[in-house]
Amino acid sequence: MSVTDPEALLLLPRLSIQNANAISSPLTWGFPSPGAFTGFVHALQRRVGISLDIELDGVGIVCHRFEAQISQPAGKRTKVFNLTRNPLNRDGSTAAIVEEGRAHLEVSLLLGVHGDGLDDHPAQEIARQVQEQAGAMRLAGGSILPWCNERFPAPNAELLMLGGSDEQRRKNQRRLTRRLLPGFALVSREALLQQHLETLRTTLPEATTLDALLDLCRINFEPPATSSEEEASPPDAAWQVRDKPGWLVPIPAGYNALSPLYLPGEVRNARDRETPLRFVENLFGLGEWLSPHRVAALSDLLWYHHAEPDKGLYRWSTPRFVEHAIA
């Protein structure tokens, strides 16, 4: 997958999102899907791209706070989503409860920027207009709240040009990285998933990619290694949790086509009769949360859409991080 190198990075700091969608796929819940953030940047590009003559492409996702709206009923081991109680119907009967997962979160977004407008407009003006438009939008189905911390001033967006000498770029990146801390960035670890699948097949030849994904994401208890003397006189039973190579999580990785691509208006009762339609199912992959200071370049954190309509694949990933992945 080839992507255009950004000419600048635009930081939207500390966005407080209320009631974001916490059900990211049929099999996962928690932090919103990366596709929600790439879609947000696409919608933001349509708002500001023409007036500023810039293109927003790619988004880095850094989470500072995540608060799932869940509770644990008394006497239960499982947790449930907090649901809303809707107003009564006209006849006074109780309205139906629509089950939905919601979460409050605080994120910083790092947008890749390129275009002629970078030379035509001051950096502060570009950052201000993009931040202003972003504050009026929804992200992952949630509302972006205005800054309400009276003790500290509202953080301003910042546009960082990636030109200049190597020393200047490193200095600017260190300064921008500090604004992302404390926080964790989400990246794709497709190479690690494939590597673990090959390791798993040495002992389990029929293992699938799903087996490798579950083995990496779940908590695995296993007995510790023992010496020959301990095997002769076995001690009491002992179990330990297998170490993981990082904070690994299953994530939605895109969509796979279930049907051919239908022409606009060909499918009855479609919401949009001017856009081609295709039925799809979720694809799953492996992600990792890591501190932004661990990457060689902040552009490695950017997520991109990648569509292959002929193959029926619509995916998102962090291709630069895959190339420079941390072992």
From Swiss-Prot:
Pfam families: Cas_Csy2. Disruption phenotype: Mutants lose phage DMS3 infection-dependent inhibition of biofilm formation while there is normal biofilm formation in the absence of phage infection. Loss of production of crRNA in the presence or absence of phage. Disruption of the entire Y.pestis-subtype CRISPR region disrupts crRNA production but does not alter phage resistance (possibly OLNs PA14_33350 to PA14_33310, and the flanking CRISPR loci), indicating this CRISPR is not involved in phage resistance. It comes from the Bacteria. One of its GO terms (biological process) is defense response to virus. InterPro entries: CRISPR-assoc_prot_Csy2 (IPR013398). The keyword Nucleus does not apply. Keywords: Antiviral defense. Coiled coil: none annotated. In this bacteria, Y.pestis-subtype CRISPRs do not confer resistance to phage DMS3 or MP22, but instead are required for DMS3 infection-dependent inhibition of biofilm formation and possibly motility. CRISPR (clustered regularly interspaced short palindromic repeat) is an adaptive immune system that provides protection against mobile genetic elements (viruses, transposable elements and conjugative plasmids). CRISPR clusters contain sequences complementary to antecedent mobile elements and target invading nucleic acids. CRISPR clusters are transcribed and processed into CRISPR RNA (crRNA). Cas3 and Cascade participate in CRISPR interference, the third stage of CRISPR immunity (Potential). Absolutely required for crRNA production or stability. Belongs to the CRISPR-associated Csy2 family. Interacts directly with Csy1; part of the Csy ribonucleoprotein complex with a probable stoichiometry of Csy1(1),Csy2(1),Csy3(6),Cas6/Csy4(1)-crRNA(1). A Csy3(6),Cas6/Csy4(1)-crRNA(1) subcomplex is also formed. This is CRISPR-associated protein Csy2. It comes from Pseudomonas aeruginosa (strain UCBPP-PA14). The gene is csy2.
